[in-house]
């Protein structure tokens, strides 16, 4: 009788061990590393650059050089935590219609001696079913 229970006990132990292993999937509420090339990360980065330029008092536009790091968190939607490098361009902000992301990315950079690079941390909250995306935090240095 004891021998017939051994496979069941072993199977239960294996199942318990598997349940305790960390999961590679996104955990609701937890931060998960993301590839900087994921389309939703790219979309959040574009939005962050657009908002940075709209909110900053700089006379010139800044464009995205690269996404250094990306993480996301499942909340009521998705929150993206982005660390990005931005560079000041030669494109001056003028009154009227502001430039969109793709136009800003086409702006020329000043000569090396005049270049200004920023490292920025952005939090972008996306709720696609509401067609809402917003910049919730921004800090650059």
From Swiss-Prot:
Protein name: Cystatin
Secondary area of contact, short sequence motif: residues: 73-77
Annotated family: Belongs to the cystatin family.
InterPro entries: Cystatin_dom, Cystatin_sf, Prot_inh_cystat_CS
SUPFAM superfamilies: Cystatin/monellin
Domain of life: Eukaryota
UniProt cross-references to PANTHER family, sorted A to Z: CYSTATIN-M
Location of the Cystatin domain: 29-129
Taxonomic lineage of the native organism: Eukaryota, Metazoa, Chordata, Craniata, Vertebrata
Signal peptide: 1-26
């Amino acid at each position: 009788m004891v021998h017939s229970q051994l496979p069941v006990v072993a199977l239960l132990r294996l199942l318990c061990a598997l349940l305790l292993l960390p999961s590679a999937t996104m955990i609701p509420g937890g931060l998960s590393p993301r590839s900087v090339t994921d389309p939703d990360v790219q979309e959040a980065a574009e939005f962050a650059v657009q908002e940075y330029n709209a909110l900053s008092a700089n006379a010139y536009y800044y464009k995205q050089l690269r996404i250094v790091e990306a993480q996301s968190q499942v909340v009521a939607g998705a929150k993206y935590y982005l660390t990005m490098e931005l560079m000041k361009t030669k494109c001056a902000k003028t009154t009227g219609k502001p430039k969109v992301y793709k136009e800003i990315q086409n702006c020329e950079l000043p000569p090396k001696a005049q270049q200004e690079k920023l490292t920025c941390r952005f939090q972008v909250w996306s709720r696609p079913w509401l067609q809402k995306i917003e910049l919730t935090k921004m800090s650059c240095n």
